Amino acid sequence: MTVLHSVDFFPSGKAPVAIEPRLPQAAFPEHHHDFHEIVIVEHGTGIHVFNGQPYTISGGTVCFVRDHDRHLYEHTDNLCLTNVLWRSPDAFQFLAGLDQLLPQEQDGYYPSHWRVNQSVLQQVRQLVGLMERAGDGVDAPAVANREILFMQLLVLLRRSSLMEGATNNDAKLNQLMAWLEDHFAEEVCWEAVAEQFSLSLRTLHRQLKQHTGLTPQRYLNRLRLIKARHLLRHSDHSVTEIAYRCGFGDSNHFSTLFRREFNWSPRDIRQGRDAIIQ
Protein backbone atom coordinates (compact mmCIF):
# COMPACT_ATOMS: atom_id res chain seq x y z
CA MET A 1 0.00 0.00 0.00
CA THR A 2 1.25 3.50 -0.85
CA VAL A 3 2.31 5.62 2.12
CA LEU A 4 2.32 9.42 1.71
CA HIS A 5 4.84 11.28 3.88
CA SER A 6 4.48 14.76 5.35
CA VAL A 7 7.94 15.78 4.13
CA ASP A 8 6.59 15.70 0.56
CA PHE A 9 3.59 17.94 1.24
CA PHE A 10 4.33 20.45 3.99
CA PRO A 11 6.30 23.60 3.08
CA SER A 12 8.67 23.27 6.05
CA GLY A 13 9.53 20.89 8.84
CA LYS A 14 7.50 22.90 11.35
CA ALA A 15 4.47 23.99 9.30
CA PRO A 16 1.41 22.33 10.92
CA VAL A 17 -0.96 22.86 7.95
CA ALA A 18 -0.69 22.58 4.15
CA ILE A 19 -3.20 23.02 1.32
CA GLU A 20 -3.17 20.47 -1.49
CA PRO A 21 -5.74 21.03 -4.29
CA ARG A 22 -6.74 18.19 -6.59
CA LEU A 23 -8.47 19.74 -9.59
CA PRO A 24 -9.46 17.17 -10.65
CA GLN A 25 -8.73 14.11 -8.52
CA ALA A 26 -8.29 11.05 -10.70
CA ALA A 27 -8.81 7.53 -9.45
CA PHE A 28 -6.08 6.86 -6.89
CA PRO A 29 -5.10 3.52 -5.30
CA GLU A 30 -5.45 2.72 -1.61
CA HIS A 31 -3.02 4.67 0.57
CA HIS A 32 -2.50 6.14 3.99
CA HIS A 33 -0.30 8.93 5.34
CA ASP A 34 1.63 10.02 8.40
CA PHE A 35 -0.52 13.15 8.75
CA HIS A 36 -4.21 14.01 9.05
CA GLU A 37 -6.35 15.32 6.20
CA ILE A 38 -9.64 17.16 5.71
CA VAL A 39 -10.97 16.36 2.23
CA ILE A 40 -13.38 19.01 0.89
CA VAL A 41 -15.26 18.03 -2.27
CA GLU A 42 -15.75 21.13 -4.44
CA HIS A 43 -17.81 19.46 -7.18
CA GLY A 44 -18.07 16.34 -9.30
CA THR A 45 -18.72 12.83 -8.04
CA GLY A 46 -16.78 9.73 -7.13
CA ILE A 47 -16.47 6.78 -4.81
CA HIS A 48 -14.40 7.19 -1.68
CA VAL A 49 -13.47 3.82 -0.20
CA PHE A 50 -12.61 4.63 3.41
CA ASN A 51 -11.19 1.84 5.59
CA GLY A 52 -12.76 -0.64 3.19
CA GLN A 53 -16.23 0.95 3.13
CA PRO A 54 -17.48 2.72 -0.03
CA TYR A 55 -19.08 6.18 0.17
CA THR A 56 -20.58 8.18 -2.68
CA ILE A 57 -19.11 11.69 -2.56
CA SER A 58 -20.15 14.88 -4.35
CA GLY A 59 -19.94 18.66 -3.95
CA GLY A 60 -20.31 19.51 -0.26
CA THR A 61 -18.94 16.25 1.12
CA VAL A 62 -16.28 16.74 3.79
CA CYS A 63 -14.20 13.78 4.96
CA PHE A 64 -11.91 13.67 7.97
CA VAL A 65 -9.01 11.28 7.43
CA ARG A 66 -6.83 10.35 10.41
CA ASP A 67 -3.18 9.36 10.19
CA HIS A 68 -4.03 5.65 10.53
CA ASP A 69 -6.96 5.55 8.08
CA ARG A 70 -6.57 4.04 4.62
CA HIS A 71 -8.58 5.25 1.62
CA LEU A 72 -8.80 5.39 -2.15
CA TYR A 73 -10.78 7.12 -4.90
CA GLU A 74 -12.41 5.37 -7.83
CA HIS A 75 -15.16 5.86 -10.42
CA THR A 76 -14.44 9.61 -10.42
CA ASP A 77 -16.30 12.03 -12.66
CA ASN A 78 -14.80 15.56 -12.71
CA LEU A 79 -14.12 15.13 -8.98
CA CYS A 80 -12.44 18.27 -7.66
CA LEU A 81 -11.06 18.29 -4.11
CA THR A 82 -9.27 20.62 -1.76
CA ASN A 83 -7.22 18.73 0.81
CA VAL A 84 -6.34 20.54 4.02
CA LEU A 85 -3.45 18.59 5.53
CA TRP A 86 -2.46 18.91 9.17
CA ARG A 87 0.34 17.12 10.98
CA SER A 88 -1.14 16.22 14.36
CA PRO A 89 -3.01 17.78 17.29
CA ASP A 90 0.25 18.51 19.11
CA ALA A 91 1.92 20.20 16.11
CA PHE A 92 0.22 23.54 16.83
CA GLN A 93 1.84 26.24 18.91
CA PHE A 94 -1.33 28.07 19.99
CA LEU A 95 -4.21 25.60 19.53
CA ALA A 96 -5.44 22.95 21.97
CA GLY A 97 -8.60 20.88 22.33
CA LEU A 98 -9.09 20.40 18.58
CA ASP A 99 -10.70 17.00 19.13
CA GLN A 100 -13.84 18.77 20.38
CA LEU A 101 -14.40 20.11 16.85
CA LEU A 102 -13.59 16.89 15.00
CA PRO A 103 -15.66 13.73 14.52
CA GLN A 104 -15.03 11.22 17.30
CA GLU A 105 -15.10 7.45 17.14
CA GLN A 106 -17.69 5.89 19.44
CA ASP A 107 -18.30 2.16 19.91
CA GLY A 108 -16.22 1.40 16.84
CA TYR A 109 -18.10 3.85 14.58
CA TYR A 110 -16.24 6.86 13.17
CA PRO A 111 -18.50 9.47 11.46
CA SER A 112 -15.87 10.35 8.88
CA HIS A 113 -18.10 11.92 6.21
CA TRP A 114 -20.02 15.16 6.79
CA ARG A 115 -21.91 17.33 4.33
CA VAL A 116 -22.17 21.12 4.09
CA ASN A 117 -24.33 23.24 1.82
CA GLN A 118 -23.20 25.36 -1.11
CA SER A 119 -23.13 28.69 0.73
CA VAL A 120 -20.89 27.16 3.40
CA LEU A 121 -18.71 25.65 0.68
CA GLN A 122 -18.16 29.18 -0.63
CA GLN A 123 -17.12 30.34 2.86
CA VAL A 124 -14.77 27.36 3.07
CA ARG A 125 -13.16 28.38 -0.24
CA GLN A 126 -12.60 31.90 1.08
CA LEU A 127 -10.98 30.60 4.28
CA VAL A 128 -8.77 28.19 2.36
CA GLY A 129 -7.72 31.07 0.11
CA LEU A 130 -6.69 33.09 3.17
CA MET A 131 -4.76 30.08 4.47
CA GLU A 132 -2.91 29.79 1.15
CA ARG A 133 -1.99 33.48 1.21
CA ALA A 134 -1.01 33.59 4.89
CA GLY A 135 2.68 33.22 4.09
CA ASP A 136 5.29 31.20 5.96
CA GLY A 137 6.55 33.70 8.53
CA VAL A 138 7.94 32.12 11.69
CA ASP A 139 7.30 34.98 14.13
CA ALA A 140 4.57 34.41 16.71
CA PRO A 141 1.88 36.66 15.12
CA ALA A 142 2.30 34.99 11.70
CA VAL A 143 2.13 31.49 13.19
CA ALA A 144 -0.87 32.45 15.33
CA ASN A 145 -2.68 33.89 12.30
CA ARG A 146 -2.28 30.65 10.32
CA GLU A 147 -3.46 28.58 13.26
CA ILE A 148 -6.46 30.88 13.82
CA LEU A 149 -7.52 30.37 10.19
CA PHE A 150 -7.35 26.60 10.63
CA MET A 151 -9.45 26.86 13.80
CA GLN A 152 -11.98 29.03 11.94
CA LEU A 153 -12.24 26.33 9.28
CA LEU A 154 -12.94 23.64 11.88
CA VAL A 155 -15.56 25.81 13.60
CA LEU A 156 -17.27 26.58 10.28
CA LEU A 157 -17.40 22.91 9.29
CA ARG A 158 -18.62 21.82 12.70
CA ARG A 159 -21.40 24.41 12.88
CA SER A 160 -22.47 23.86 9.30
CA SER A 161 -22.33 20.09 9.04
CA LEU A 162 -25.30 17.81 8.78
CA MET A 163 -24.94 17.12 12.49
CA GLU A 164 -26.09 20.62 13.34
CA GLY A 165 -29.41 20.14 11.53
CA ALA A 166 -29.97 23.30 9.49
CA THR A 167 -33.37 23.76 7.85
CA ASN A 168 -32.79 25.22 4.37
CA ASN A 169 -33.25 23.13 1.21
CA ASP A 170 -29.52 22.46 0.83
CA ALA A 171 -29.35 21.09 4.37
CA LYS A 172 -32.48 19.01 3.84
CA LEU A 173 -30.96 17.48 0.72
CA ASN A 174 -27.77 16.70 2.65
CA GLN A 175 -29.85 14.93 5.28
CA LEU A 176 -31.70 13.02 2.57
CA MET A 177 -28.45 11.87 0.94
CA ALA A 178 -27.11 10.70 4.28
CA TRP A 179 -30.39 8.82 4.86
CA LEU A 180 -30.01 7.08 1.49
CA GLU A 181 -26.52 5.89 2.48
CA ASP A 182 -28.13 3.99 5.36
CA HIS A 183 -31.43 2.95 3.72
CA PHE A 184 -30.34 2.22 0.13
CA ALA A 185 -31.58 -1.39 0.27
CA GLU A 186 -35.14 -0.42 1.16
CA GLU A 187 -37.93 0.23 -1.32
CA VAL A 188 -37.84 3.98 -1.88
CA CYS A 189 -40.92 6.01 -2.72
CA TRP A 190 -39.60 9.40 -3.76
CA GLU A 191 -42.86 11.19 -2.93
CA ALA A 192 -42.69 9.84 0.63
CA VAL A 193 -38.99 10.63 0.95
CA ALA A 194 -39.55 14.19 -0.28
CA GLU A 195 -42.30 14.62 2.31
CA GLN A 196 -40.11 13.09 5.05
CA PHE A 197 -37.46 15.75 4.45
CA SER A 198 -39.92 18.60 3.86
CA LEU A 199 -38.99 19.03 0.20
CA SER A 200 -41.23 19.23 -2.81
CA LEU A 201 -40.67 16.38 -5.25
CA ARG A 202 -39.64 18.88 -7.91
CA THR A 203 -37.06 20.49 -5.59
CA LEU A 204 -35.69 17.07 -4.64
CA HIS A 205 -35.19 16.14 -8.30
CA ARG A 206 -33.67 19.49 -9.24
CA GLN A 207 -31.26 19.73 -6.31
CA LEU A 208 -30.09 16.13 -6.42
CA LYS A 209 -29.40 16.52 -10.15
CA GLN A 210 -27.43 19.72 -9.46
CA HIS A 211 -25.39 18.06 -6.70
CA THR A 212 -24.66 14.72 -8.37
CA GLY A 213 -25.48 15.05 -12.07
CA LEU A 214 -27.93 12.16 -11.66
CA THR A 215 -31.68 11.80 -11.30
CA PRO A 216 -32.80 10.48 -7.90
CA GLN A 217 -33.42 6.95 -9.18
CA ARG A 218 -30.10 6.80 -11.03
CA TYR A 219 -28.32 8.09 -7.93
CA LEU A 220 -30.00 5.41 -5.81
CA ASN A 221 -29.16 2.71 -8.35
CA ARG A 222 -25.51 3.80 -8.41
CA LEU A 223 -25.41 3.77 -4.61
CA ARG A 224 -26.84 0.24 -4.57
CA LEU A 225 -24.42 -0.94 -7.24
CA ILE A 226 -21.44 0.49 -5.37
CA LYS A 227 -22.50 -1.32 -2.19
CA ALA A 228 -23.03 -4.50 -4.23
CA ARG A 229 -19.56 -4.26 -5.78
CA HIS A 230 -18.07 -3.96 -2.30
CA LEU A 231 -19.89 -7.13 -1.19
CA LEU A 232 -18.80 -8.98 -4.32
CA ARG A 233 -15.19 -8.20 -3.47
CA HIS A 234 -15.32 -8.71 0.28
CA SER A 235 -18.01 -11.30 1.09
CA ASP A 236 -18.93 -14.87 0.22
CA HIS A 237 -22.60 -14.11 -0.51
CA SER A 238 -23.94 -15.31 -3.85
CA VAL A 239 -24.62 -12.81 -6.62
CA THR A 240 -28.36 -13.33 -6.17
CA GLU A 241 -28.19 -12.76 -2.41
CA ILE A 242 -26.10 -9.61 -2.89
CA ALA A 243 -28.63 -8.30 -5.41
CA TYR A 244 -31.42 -8.69 -2.85
CA ARG A 245 -29.32 -7.31 0.00
CA CYS A 246 -28.68 -4.16 -2.04
CA GLY A 247 -32.30 -3.47 -2.96
CA PHE A 248 -32.67 -5.22 -6.33
CA GLY A 249 -35.69 -7.49 -6.66
CA ASP A 250 -34.39 -9.29 -9.73
CA SER A 251 -30.83 -10.62 -10.06
CA ASN A 252 -30.91 -10.50 -13.87
CA HIS A 253 -31.88 -6.82 -13.82
CA PHE A 254 -29.15 -6.25 -11.23
CA SER A 255 -26.54 -7.90 -13.48
CA THR A 256 -27.62 -5.79 -16.46
CA LEU A 257 -27.36 -2.52 -14.49
CA PHE A 258 -24.07 -3.62 -12.94
CA ARG A 259 -22.41 -4.28 -16.29
CA ARG A 260 -23.75 -0.99 -17.67
CA GLU A 261 -22.31 0.94 -14.70
CA PHE A 262 -18.90 -0.72 -14.34
CA ASN A 263 -18.29 -2.46 -17.70
CA TRP A 264 -17.78 -5.69 -15.76
CA SER A 265 -20.27 -8.38 -14.82
CA PRO A 266 -20.82 -9.26 -11.13
CA ARG A 267 -19.10 -12.59 -11.82
CA ASP A 268 -16.06 -10.74 -13.26
CA ILE A 269 -15.75 -8.71 -10.05
CA ARG A 270 -16.20 -11.79 -7.87
CA GLN A 271 -13.37 -13.51 -9.75
CA GLY A 272 -11.11 -10.45 -9.57
CA ARG A 273 -10.87 -9.93 -13.32
CA ASP A 274 -11.00 -6.16 -12.88
CA ALA A 275 -7.95 -6.18 -10.58
CA ILE A 276 -5.54 -5.60 -13.46
CA ILE A 277 -6.82 -2.05 -13.97
CA GLN A 278 -7.54 -1.13 -10.36
Swiss-Prot record:
Subcellular location: Cytoplasm
Main location: cytoplasm
A UniProt-annotated Pfam family: AraC_binding
GO CC annotation terms, alphabetical: cytoplasm
Function of the molecule: Activates expression of the rhaBAD and rhaT operons.
Positions bearing the site annotation: Interaction with sigma-70: E241, D250
SMART domains: HTH_ARAC (SM00342)
Keywords in alphabetical order: Activator, Cytoplasm, DNA-binding, Repeat, Rhamnose metabolism, Transcription, Transcription regulation
DNA-binding region: 191-212, 239-262
The species this protein was found in: Salmonella agona (strain SL483)
GO molecular function: DNA-binding transcription factor activity; sequence-specific DNA binding
HAMAP family: HTH_type_RhaS (MF_01534)
Family annotation (InterPro entries): AraC-bd (IPR003313), AraC_XylS_family_regulators (IPR050204), Homeodomain-like_sf (IPR009057), HTH-like (IPR037923), HTH_AraC (IPR018060), HTH_AraC-typ_CS (IPR018062), RhaR_RhaS-like_N (IPR047220), RmlC-like_jellyroll (IPR014710)
Superkingdom per UniProt: Bacteria
Gene3D superfamilies, per database record: Homeodomain-like (1.10.10.60), Jelly Rolls (2.60.120.10)
Protein name: HTH-type transcriptional activator RhaS
Residues annotated as domain HTH araC/xylS-type: 174-272
Record carries keyword Repressor: no
An example Gene Ontology biological process: positive regulation of DNA-templated transcription
Subunit structure: Binds DNA as a dimer.
Spans traversing the lipid bilayer: none
